Amino acid sequence: MSLERTPPYLQVVAALKAKIVSGELKHGDTLPSVRDLAAQYEISTATAQKVHRTLKAEGLAEAKQGSATTVSTRRTLHRTAADRLESALSTGRIYADGEYAVITSAALAEPPEWVADLLGTESGQAVRRERVTHSADDQPVSASVSWFSADLAETVPALLVRDRIIGGTPSAIEAATGRRAVATEEATTAAAATEDQAALLGVAAGAPVLLSRNVYVDAQGDTIEVGESVAPAGRWRVHRD
């Protein structure tokens, strides 16, 4: 496999990042060696070494003395709403290997005005689900709140149950209604953790966090889900073209 654009090492880094985000390369997996990278991508060993150094600098890989370079994501990788939607639709799993979620609440509630506008709800009520996602070593990696139109409470009653929905909510909604989430729009900003967010993430109130708001839409562009999530500092968000 050859690379046409420069700088070559960034192209290889991007290819490996895509495999890490998708879960093809999991935490603890061995990365291709310098020699293997050089042969696979037709690059020099010096360039291949730069690939390893870049992934280590970004916290996505680690190497111990005398050992191979391995994937390291439990404390460094922030998976976006788009990443999780892609995983749910392609594999039936919304969480990465080793991750698990705890649903802390599921009920009908009055949504904030910005959520109501996006959902197009006029009833004053919507389904609200709150969850905290943990890594395999039980560290919180994000806390999120998802909102759905109140009419989905009847067609997808699992939304009002404080339990994980196997395969994720997008798959459950598609199975019940035929509406498939095909895209997500996401906006992010740096913020200071509120007291509630700090308690969920295990950080100090006022600590820097990444705040994201996302919207899942179907093929007609209609909103299926509106969400807001918060993640602690020090986790890398990987963008894929």
UniProtKB/Swiss-Prot annotation:
Any coiled-coil regions, as ranges: none
Transmembrane stretches, by residue range? none
Q: Which UniProt keywords apply?
A: DNA-binding, Plasmid, Repressor, Transcription, Transcription regulation
Q: Which GO terms describe its biological process?
A: negative regulation of DNA-templated transcription
Matching entries from InterPro entries are given as: Bact_HTH_transcr_reg, Chorismate_lyase_/UTRA_dom_sf, Tscrpt_reg_HTH_GntR, UTRA, WH-like_DNA-bd_sf, WH_DNA-bd_sf
Q: Which CDD domains match?
A: WHTH_GntR (cd07377)
Any single GO molecular-function term of the entry would be: DNA binding
Start and end residues of each HTH gntR-type domain: 6-74
Keyword Lipid biosynthesis attached: no
Q: What ranges are recorded for DNA binding?
A: 34-53
Q: Which SUPFAM superfamilies match?
A: Chorismate lyase-like, Winged helix' DNA-binding domain
Q: Which Pfam families match?
A: GntR, UTRA
Q: Where is the signal peptide?
A: none
Per its database record, what is this protein's job?
Answer: Controls plasmid transfer and prevents the lethal effects of the tra/kilA gene. Repressor for the transcription of certain pIJ101 promoters, including those the from kilA and kilB loci.
The protein's name in its UniProt record: Protein KorA
Q: Source species, please?
A: Streptomyces lividans
Instruction: From the UniProt record, report the name of the gene that encodes this protein.
Output: korA
